[in-house]
Amino acid sequence: MKALSSIYLFILALTLGVEVAIGLSAPVLFRSDLYITPGTLSALQAGTLLAQVFMKYNYIALFCGFFALLFEIFSWRGSEASFGLKFSTLMLSLIIAVLACLFYYFTSYITAAAALGESAIDENFARIHEASETTLKIAMIARLGLFFLRAKISVFAPLKSKSK
């Protein structure tokens, strides 16, 4: 179980790293005029490129979300952690899995709308886009919380019991 816990923490950290990288690259793509010849990349083209990045990210987020949920479900009985800690990690993993599915839906919608061109970018598109950004931010916060709670259970709790 120790090796699987280490892999689990690595997957959570890796996904967080991908989310940070996406968060850093999105503004660069949408403000490409600051870095390359102005007019080289339209907002629609930048969005199309970023949508491809998000489609690939979705696979990582979905895998991480459902791996986390399954890990927390199956480790429930074997864990010596308090009920509150186990319940928190289970709920955070459920939130992460649900948000990954929601983000996948948003990305599919945004990609389909962008494929239709400028005419599809309306108020509804803007609301969906904003909701997808909020979803990603909440998922990052939940994943970060889950990482630290799981590290407390998997890494620090065994160290405490050995020192007694």
Regions found by a protein language model. Give the residues of each.
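Helical transmembrane-bundle signal
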Residues: 12-22, 61, 65-68, 96-99, ...
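Interfacial loop at the N-terminal end of multi-pass membrane proteins
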Residues: 2-64, 75, 119-122
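Alpha-helical transmembrane segments and their helix-start/interface "positive-inside/aromatic belt" motifs
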Residues: 1-16, 82-93, 145, 149-153
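Transmembrane helix-loop junctions and nearby membrane-interface residues
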Residues: 20-33, 69-76, 100-107, 144-154
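Individual transmembrane alpha-helices with interfacial aromatic-anchor signatures
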Residues: 53-54, 122-140
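Hydrophobic alpha-helical transmembrane segments of integral membrane proteins
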Residues: 87-112
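Cytoplasmic juxtamembrane regions at transmembrane-helix boundaries
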Residues: 71-93, 154-164
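Membrane-proximal helix-loop-helix units in multi-pass membrane proteins
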Residues: 111-119
